Each structure stands twice: as C-alpha cells, then as structure tokens.
UniProtKB/Swiss-Prot annotation:
Protein name as catalogued: CTP synthase
Gene symbol of the encoding locus: pyrG
Keyword vocabulary terms for this entry: ATP-binding, Glutamine amidotransferase, Ligase, Magnesium, Metal-binding, Nucleotide-binding, Pyrimidine biosynthesis
Positions contributing to L-glutamine binding: G353, L381, G382, M383, Q384, E404, R471
InterPro entries linked to this entry: Class_I_gatase-like (IPR029062), CTP_synthase (IPR004468), CTP_synthase_N (IPR017456), GATASE (IPR017926), GATase1_CTP_Synthase (IPR033828), P-loop_NTPase (IPR027417)
Cellular component, GO annotation: cytosol
Molecular-function annotations in GO: ATP binding; CTP synthase activity; glutaminase activity; identical protein binding; metal ion binding
Other comment: CTPSs have evolved a hybrid strategy for distinguishing between UTP and CTP. The overlapping regions of the product feedback inhibitory and substrate sites recognize a common feature in both compounds, the triphosphate moiety. To differentiate isosteric substrate and product pyrimidine rings, an additional pocket far from the expected kinase/ligase catalytic site, specifically recognizes the cytosine and ribose portions of the product inhibitor.
Functional description taken from the UniProt entry: Catalyzes the ATP-dependent amination of UTP to CTP with either L-glutamine or ammonia as the source of nitrogen. Regulates intracellular CTP levels through interactions with the four ribonucleotide triphosphates.
Annotated residues for binding of CTP: S13, D146, I147, E148, K186, T187, K188, P189, T190, Q191, K222
Residue positions binding Mg(2+): D71, E139
Length: 544
C-alpha cells in the first residue's frame, strides 16, 4: 500500500515547499524506497501553459507533454522518478472533469457539490498519481488559509481519516522570522498557521520551520508546546548557498526517522554520499566562467529555473563556478544594438521565449557571438533567432524573420507548422486562430542526429529523445539556401516532417542551437551532455 506525505505551507508563500518536499523524497529514495511526487495547484487555470512567466515563473514540461509548475522540475532533479501529467493537477482540471461528468449524466441527476464531488475527484487523482509507489509526497500549492486551497485540504483530511495515521503524514512548512530591531525570533506566526490547520481538521505531524538562523532550544520547545507537535519533529530549514544542501540538512535533524517510524517503513539507513559529492563540487570549484543569458524575462529569473540549474549541474561536472549574467534583450534594442556588455563574457546563451518583444536585441547578441567566435548556445527561440540572423547576414535573405514576429515578412524562415506527427504516431493540426493552451508541440520527441556533426559528438549517439515546447518551426523551404550558405542542420525530427531540431556552424569554435529544451532532463547527479559541452567550450574560450 502506498504511504502518503502531504506537504503544506503557512504564513507566507514562496517559503520553499517544493524544495523541502523534494529533499524529503531524495532522503527516502536513498533509503531504498520507490518514491513519487505530486503537485496540487489551487489556481483555476487548467495548466500554467498560457500564464505569463512574470506571474508564474517557468513552465516545466514533462516527458509526456504536460505543462506544469516549476516544482516538478525540482522533483525530477532530486529523485530518479520521471514526472508525467498524473503528477500535477490544478483546480481548473478538477472542475473541468467534474463538470464534464455532470454534462454526461454520470451523477444521475444529483446536485454536484464541492463535497463530495470535487474532493472525490481530488482524491481519485492523488491515488492515480501515487499508484505503484512505496511513498507519494503530495505538495499542496498556496498557503493554508487561502480560500482556493480549501477543497484540497479537505480532501487530504478525508484521506487521513480513511487511511489512518500510519499511512499518512502531514508536514507543514512555516515561517519563523527574526526581528532584528528586537533581537528576537518570533514563533507567533507559526502558532497561528497551525491554529488555522486545526480549524479545518489537520494536525501537523512535522513542522518545518523556515528560518535564517539556527533555532534555539527554547523556541523549539515553545513551538512544540503550543502547536501540539513532538519537539523532535520541529525541524529547521535554514538558508543555504545551494538547494542541494537541503537533503543532508533535513536528514541531520532526523526527519526521515520520524517519517519511517510513523509510516511503519522498515528500510535501510540513508546514504547521501551522492548529495555530499554534489555539494562538495559546488563549494570547491577549480574554474570560473561567465555566461551571458540574453532574454526578456530577466527581471524574474524563476522564468529560467531549469536552465539555470542545468548550467549549475554542468559546473558540478566540470568543477566550474558558472556565473550567469542576465542581459535584457530589450535594453540592447533600446541602445541601438549595443552589445558592449557581452565583451567580458566567456559564452552567450539565448533561451526560449514567446512574442516579438526583445527579438532584435537577441539577434544582435547572436551576431556578436558568431562574428567574434564566442561560444553560443541557443534553445528553442534561441535557435530560431540564430537561424534568422544567419539568413539575414550570411545567406543574404533580406527581410528574413519568423511569422510569429512579422506575418508578412519577405522570407519567413520560421513559420507556424500546421500539421505534425506526435510521439505516439497520431497527427495534430493547428492554425493562427487555434487556442493557445495545449496547442504546441509538447513533450519528448525522437531526434535523429547527423553522423559526424557536433550534435552527434556531444550526445555520443545519432538517436536522442528530448522534450519540446514550441509552436513555430524552421521553414524547410529555406533549408537548402541556408545549407548552401554554410549552415549545418545537425539534427531533424524522426517523424515524416523532418523538422529542423539542431543547427551548428562548422567554422566557429562552438556554435550550437536546438529547437528542444534539454534543460528539462538535466539533474545534478548526471548533468546533461549539452550543457557540459557548453561550459567546456566557455572554459576553452576563456583560456584562448
């Protein structure tokens, strides 16, 4: 039978529930358990696919093509399980399914209510996502007390009642502030958030206290007394330099022993050797490189979370401190294409994105990298930008652009593809008037790499599988012209469309761009060959 750990948060948002939950999962996995994770989002959006990065941060794409919360990226980076669409759902999806059942007559004319119909659907989805695992860690988005979260909290209350204390555990993350003016740690916010939980029938078994300093024994005893939680189950979650220090930090306080005792799990001792090696590599780099990330969401770096982490993973595997400088592509445009801020950079990266804002600034950055032999990595839109720049400045295709930015451009080298084959062999179609939500090329797709290409050398194979999230493709009608001008198409999709997947420049020290998102499959234990190769190229450029 699957055991459930429910992780909730109180006082304020953005305390790090996802990291805490993922760290617990990593510890339990190191003890030999088969662990999965679920994220329950209270918003009414069906998924975050159409939400602004400034509102939501990064959209993480699962292997099977679900657009999900960035916390699922943390889950995959901390444990070995691959997330799917079953590992994430929102209020919007729950209501959508319940209403569809009502329309079909599944409820036999009954009045459809939050209890039991909505809560039953939530429980069904939790059990579905947890099936086949020893332990499922379920993170409830939002903050206890929010009206949006109430159906989810009621659902897990019912699960505790139905499954019992030895099969369920509540871990609550709270904020314990230090008031500098008074020189005191304040426990009252934590007392109040637990009071809020108790009012809806939830008693925390573990309290994880988010703090910027070690918790004194007196405060620990006080919280235990007022919150009715064992003193040893008051666990500190302190500020650290790297999120990968968190599993060891929580383990050292015995959190996994508390969990295994309550859930009656007879398992081996934790082995965090791999995590200790990762932390040691992060703390003791032998080299340093500076990489410019040129994008338009740079004011909220959470928009590029997986990408930032993938570069850090590459640093772990090359003993390098990867220092990222975020460059606003709009500022380059406003300053007439001035890219002087790139001159001290060892490499340049242009990430994915949508819309025309800041595009010409990105094109200027690509031009600088190409003309000055600076290692360049383009991802998704970053590949399309590189291709547009090459078409304009090398292939002589004046007016080259993407129809995403200029529907009537003279040379649409990037355009909306209206039909393509999915990974399971079915055919999907779209046009300019199609809904934005769920209409992109999503999830893992097979890619064929050209023998002898830089792509094949990086991956060590001519057949790879990478995740996608995009609506526009390279226009194959222009490929012959671009190839004649020296551009190398190093990879194409395995389907009948032969869509361009990677491009490279043979006469450049290291110039590579891909349509897919390799950052979604990078983790600190293994890294990713593309990012490792990119950081090595930056190191070589620095030495040169």
């Amino acid at each position: 039978m699957t055991k459930f750990i429910f992780v909730t948060g109180g006082v304020v948002s953005s305390l790090g529930k996802g990291i805490a939950a993922a760290s617990i999962a990593a510890i339990l996995e190191s003890r030999g358990l088969n662990v999965t994770m679920l994220k329950l989002d209270p918003y009414i959006n069906v998924d975050p696919g159409t939400m602004s990065p400034f509102q939501h941060g990064e959209v993480f794409v699962t292997d099977d093509g679900a657009e999900t919360d960035l916390d699922l990226g943390h889950y995959e980076r901390f444990i070995d399980s691959t997330m799917t669409r079953r590992n994430s759902f929102s209020t919007g999806q729950v209501y959508e399914n319940v209403i569809a059942k009502e329309r079909r007559g599944d409820y036999l004319g009954g009045t459809v209510q939050v209890i039991p119909h909505i809560t039953d659907e939530i429980k069904r989805r939790i059990h579905e996502g947890a099936a086949g695992y020893d332990v499922a860690i379920v993170e409830i988005g939002g903050t206890v007390g929010d009206i949006e979260s109430l159906p989810f909290l009621e659902a897990i209350r019912q699960m505790r009642s139905q499954l019992g204390r030895n099969n369920t555990l509540f871990a609550h993350l709270s904020y314990v502030p230090y008031i500098a003016a008074a020189g005191e740690i304040k426990t009252k916010p934590t007392q109040h958030t637990v009071k809020e939980m108790l009012s809806i029938g939830l008693q925390p078994d573990i309290l994880i206290c988010r703090m910027d300093r070690t918790m004194p024994a007196d405060e620990r005893r006080k919280i235990a007394l007022f919150c009715n939680v064992e003193e040893r189950a008051i666990v500190g979650s302190y500020d650290v330099d790297s999120i990968y220090e968190c599993p060891e930090m929580l383990h050292d306080q015995g959190i996994d022993n508390i969990i295994t005792e309550q859930l009656q799990l007879n398992v081996q001792q934790a082995d965090l050797t791999a995590w200790k090696k990762i932390v040691h590599a992060i703390q003791n780099p032998k080299h340093t490189v500076k990489i410019a990330m040129v994008g338009k969401y740079v004011d909220l770096t959470e928009s590029y979370k997986s990408l930032i982490e993938a570069l850090k993973h590459a640093g772990v595997h090359t003993e390098t401190d990867v220092q990222i400088t975020f460059v606003d592509s709009e500022s380059i445009e406003k300053n007439n294409g001035d890219v002087s801020m790139l001159k001290d950079m060892d490499a340049i990266l242009v990430p994915g994105g949508f819309g025309s804002r800041g595009v010409e600034g990105k094109i200027a950055a690509v031009r600088y990298a190409r003309e000055n032999n600076v290692p360049y990595l383009g991802i998704c839109l970053g590949m399309q930008i590189a291709l547009i720049e090459y078409a304009r400045d090398v292939a002589g295709l004046k007016g080259a652009n993407s129809t995403e930015f200029d529907l009537k451009c003279a040379a649409p080298v990037v355009a909306l593809i209206d039909e393509w084959q999915t990974a399971d062999g079915s055919v999907e179609t779209r046009d300019e008037s199609a809904d934005l939500g769920g209409t992109m090329r999503l999830g893992a797709q097979e890619v064929e790499l050209k023998a002898g290409s830089l792509a094949a050398k990086i991956y060590g194979s001519e057949h790879i599988r990478e995740r996608h999230r995009h609506r526009y493709e390279v226009n194959n009608n222009y490929v012959p012209t671009l190839e004649q001008a020296g551009l190398v198409i190093g990879g194409v999709s395995a389907g009948r469309e032969r869509l361009v997947e990677t491009i490279e420049l043979p006469n450049h020290p290291w110039f590579f761009a891909c349509q897919f998102h390799p950052e979604f499959t990078s983790n600190p234990r293994k890294g990713h060959p593309l990012f490792t190769a990119f950081v090595k190229a930056a190191l070589n450029n620095k030495k040169a």
